[in-house]
From Swiss-Prot:
PANTHER family: CYSTATHIONINE BETA-SYNTHASE (PTHR10314). It catalyses: O-acetyl-L-serine + hydrogen sulfide = L-cysteine + acetate; hydrogen cyanide + L-cysteine = 3-cyano-L-alanine + hydrogen sulfide + H(+). Pfam families: PALP. Pyridoxal 5'-phosphate binds at residues 100, 204-208, 292. Induction: Slightly down-regulated by ethylene treatment. No effect from wounding. One of its GO terms (cellular component) is cytoplasm. The keyword Amino-acid biosynthesis applies. This is Bifunctional L-3-cyanoalanine synthase/cysteine synthase 2, mitochondrial. The modification N6-(pyridoxal phosphate)lysine is found at residue 69. Keywords: Amino-acid biosynthesis, Cysteine biosynthesis, Lyase, Mitochondrion, Pyridoxal phosphate, Transferase, Transit peptide. Homodimer. PROSITE patterns: CYS_SYNTHASE. Its cofactor is pyridoxal 5'-phosphate. The gene is PCAS-2.
Length: 347
């Protein structure tokens, strides 16, 4: 079986090389990574009733794997390849993740021909696990009580024991920030015609808020940048790490790449408020998004309600699609309801 798998993989790679030299002249993308970026923005209308400011949201659910993490996954792999640190079919990539970055990494590894090993806390959703495995990645779950710290520790253990292994280190990799300076920031500036006044974004690795913030500030120093973290794990506000449901934010330590001086403030949003807002966005705005997107919206609404921000344009991000959270606290009640539904008789 292993021999057959290797044969099919080699045949696929050979076919791809042949295919790439024989493409007809069209506007069709030659590979799926070219679909990354240039996501649309939309104004929120119903959940913003009573606010004095406008809120526009960049919809990263339109990325190939339905999350913003496709951007840094592609950037970090390309950067490492250019530096000669990794090569397809030879390097095993190992990365700790809370979910979306792992999915994006697995997606890129499958496309480029890398073996991918991911470590992840066991409290993350079943959808994340299945999606990573669907892309061919190996997945190791870690003790949920150890949080992301335990996940990172396990990844480093694997890095030391695995031949030809490499870790892209999203929490300290400058390419994670640079891709948002090069793509996400300019896209926001162009779509708002330079009229953005405030940008607010949850802090996980810190790549998005730092990269976008630096770009917007370079275009207009008066743009205000805000971060946010879970109330239950508010280490950037001097608190202690703790369990929460805003997956992807509040990793329990200050990431190396986050620029705290860039931000006016790091707002705090509770898991309960984030979950409730994500649900509300689905039924009121038709936007089915994840929990961190709910948190971003809560923070944007708080800023929009401040008298000093009346008439201003606030931009935030919906980082991922809500279908990835069906088994999580976000939709677990609806899932149980759906599982218990009984068919009606039809005459």
């Amino acid at each position: 079986m292993a021999t057959l798998s290797r044969f099919l993989k080699k045949r696929s790679l050979a076919s791809n090389r042949l295919f790439s030299t024989q493409l007809p002249h069209t506007n069709i993308k030659s590979e799926v990574s070219q679909l990354i970026g240039k996501t649309p923005m939309v104004y929120l209308k119903k959940v913003t009733e009573g606010c004095g400011a406008y809120i526009a949201v960049k919809q990263e659910m339109f990325q190939p794997t339905s999350s913003i993490k496709d951007r840094p996954a592609l950037a970090m792999i390309n950067d490492a390849e250019k530096k000669g640190l990794i090569s397809p079919e030879k390097t095993t990539l190992i990365e700790p993740t809370s979910g979306n970055m792992g999915i994006s990494m697995a997606f890129m590894a499958a496309m480029k021909g890398y073996k991918m090993v991911l470590t992840m806390p066991s409290y993350t959703s079943m959808e994340r696990r299945v999606t990573m495995r669907a892309f061919g990645a190996d997945l190791i779950l870690t003790d949920p009580t150890k949080g992301m710290g335990g996940t990172v520790k396990k990844a480093y253990e694997l890095l030391e024991s695995t031949p030809n292994a490499f870790m892209l280190q999203q929490f300290s990799n400058p390419a994670n920030t640079q891709v948002h300076f090069d793509t996400t920031g300019p896209e926001i500036w162009e779509e708002t015609l330079g009229n953005v006044d405030i940008f607010v974004m949850g802090i996980g690795s810190g790549g998005t808020v730092t990269g976008v913030g630096l770009y917007l500030k370079s275009k207009n120093p008066n743009v205000k940048i805000y971060g946010l973290e879970p109330t239950e794990s508010n280490i950037l506000n001097g608190g202690k790490p703790g369990p929460h449901h805003i997956t992807g934010n509040g990793v329990g330590s200050k990431p190396d790449i986050v620029d705290m001086d860039l931000m006016e403030e790091v707002l705090m949003v509770s898991s309960e408020d984030a979950v409730n807002m994500a649900r509300e966005l689905a039924v009121k705005e038709g936007l089915m998004v994840g929990i961190s997107s709910g948190a971003n919206t809560v923070a944007a609404l708080r800023l929009a309600q401040k008298p000093e921000n009346k008439g201003k344009l606030i931009v935030t991000v919906h980082a991922s699609f809500g279908e990835r959270y069906l088994s999580s606290v976000l939709y677990q009640d609806l899932r149980k309801e759906a599982e218990n539904m009984q068919p009606v008789s039809v005459d």
